[in-house]
């Protein structure tokens, strides 16, 4: 671990909860942004089937 000396400045009892808390907050913000800016994601989470909007011709 190349950042081991960070724990001489910040106690692990303070630093680890801050690190994990910030990761949690970022994950929640990303999920909120995806849910509020797309129409398909909330339908996907509710179990609705995807609508096929166009067909693909191969060959």
Swiss-Prot record:
Periplasmic side: 36-59
Coiled-coil segments on the chain, per record: none
Keywords: Antenna complex, Bacteriochlorophyll, Cell inner membrane, Cell membrane, Chlorophyll, Chromophore, Light-harvesting polypeptide, Magnesium, Membrane, Metal-binding, Transmembrane, Transmembrane helix
Top-rank lineage group of the source organism: Bacteria
Predominant location category: membrane
Keyword set includes Glycoprotein: no
GO cellular component: organelle inner membrane; plasma membrane; plasma membrane light-harvesting complex
Alphabetical list of InterPro entries matching this protein: Antenna_a/b (IPR000066), Antenna_alpha (IPR018332), Antenna_alpha_CS (IPR002361), Light-harvesting_complex (IPR035889)
Bilayer-crossing regions: 12-35
Ranges of the Cytoplasmic topological domain: 1-11
Residues holding a bacteriochlorophyll: 31
Location of this chain's protein in the cell: Cell inner membrane
Molecular function terms from GO: bacteriochlorophyll binding; electron transporter, transferring electrons within the cyclic electron transport pathway of photosynthesis activity; metal ion binding
Pfam families: LHC (PF00556)
Protein topology in the membrane: Single-pass type II membrane protein
UniProt keyword annotation of Lipoprotein present: no
GO terms for biological process, alphabetical: photosynthesis, light reaction
Function of the molecule: Antenna complexes are light-harvesting systems, which transfer the excitation energy to the reaction centers.
Subunit: The core complex is formed by different alpha and beta chains, binding bacteriochlorophyll molecules, and arranged most probably in tetrameric structures disposed around the reaction center. The non-pigmented gamma chains may constitute additional components.
Family: Belongs to the antenna complex alpha subunit family.
This protein's name: Light-harvesting protein B-800-850 alpha chain A
UniProt organism field: Rhodopseudomonas palustris (strain ATCC BAA-98 / CGA009)
């Amino acid at each position: 671990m190349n950042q081991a000396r960070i724990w001489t400045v910040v106690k692990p009892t303070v630093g680890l909860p801050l690190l994990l808390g910030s990761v949690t907050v970022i994950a929640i913000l990303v999920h909120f942004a995806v849910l509020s800016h797309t129409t398909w994601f909330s339908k996907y989470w509710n179990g609705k089937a995807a609508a096929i909007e166009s067909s693909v011709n191969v060959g």
